[in-house]
């Protein structure tokens, strides 16, 4: 919502330009209607994963920029039905689309070894093994609500830390449930294929795992490229990215105060 409004206000003085916004969460349609009402047919909302951006029917010759905002909206975080946040008291769901598996399924059914790896690799949680072990021991009673999981984590992580003790575990579950890693990689690859010469690709990340993938992608598809087994090989004389910002742009102290989630 904020990105689209800013683009219209700052960049799209030409009334022939349009914004096409993608979101896999169907509830975003409510917000999208506000923009449609304000900007008419210059704003188009598509209820779709951004990994499927290549399936949209538009001429890539007229495509000027693609922006990925990998964070969750305040509405999504506060939605008790989604159970995305450790600060909300809702069911352990975390699904943004028509996913078959919920966070409840993962926490209550996944074997110890796999659960421990999820916390370790997707959340970089140092106490992944002991948290997974305690979940296994407790889940015979069923772990249903977000606060049930928070209580397990807080009983293990006693020491005070700069971030909430549940941050990494909840992050890892969101990544797994919504298949975020492969969605991001596919979205980046398909964007590269779509963008014409001179097109812009900007990505807003919110944690180190996303950040590493994006940096790796740009390095692989830039002037300093080295072919990678994780991304398709670029043939010689093909278009490549010119990296504008060698270092990521991070939020100011004032922005963090106004928008705490941006601290990531």
What are these regions (language model features)?
Residues 1-264:
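S-adenosyl-L-methionine-dependent methyltransferase catalytic core, i.e., the SAM/SAH-binding region
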């Amino acid at each position: 919502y904020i990105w689209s409004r800013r683009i219209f206000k700052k960049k799209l003085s030409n009334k022939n330009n349009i914004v096409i916004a993608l979101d896999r969460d169907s509830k975003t349609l409510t917000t999208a209607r506000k923009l449609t009402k304000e900007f008419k047919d210059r704003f188009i909302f598509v209820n779709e994963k951004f990994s499927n951006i290549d399936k949209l029917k538009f001429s890539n010759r007229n495509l000027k920029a693609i922006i990925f905002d990998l964070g969750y909206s305040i509405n999504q975080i506060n939605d008790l039905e989604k159970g995305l946040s450790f600060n909300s008291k809702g069911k352990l769901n975390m699904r943004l689309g028509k996913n078959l598996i919920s966070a409840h399924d993962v926490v209550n059914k996944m074997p110890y070894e796999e659960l421990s790896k999820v916390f370790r690799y997707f959340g970089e949680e140092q106490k992944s093994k002991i948290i997974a072990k305690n979940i296994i021991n407790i889940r015979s009673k069923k772990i249903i609500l977000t606060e049930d999981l928070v209580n397990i984590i807080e009983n293990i992580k006693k020491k005070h830390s700069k971030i909430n003790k549940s941050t990494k575990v909840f992050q890892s579950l969101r990544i797994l449930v919504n298949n975020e890693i492969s969605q991001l990689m596919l979205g980046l690859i398909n964007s590269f294929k779509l963008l014409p010469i001179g097109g812009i690709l900007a990505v807003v990340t919110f944690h180190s795992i996303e950040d590493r993938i994006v940096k790796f992608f740009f390095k692989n598809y830039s002037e300093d490229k080295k072919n990678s087994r994780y991304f398709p090989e670029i043939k010689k004389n093909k278009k490549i990215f010119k990296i504008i910002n060698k270092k990521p742009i991070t939020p100011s102290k004032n922005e963090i105060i106004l928008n705490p989630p941006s601290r990531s």
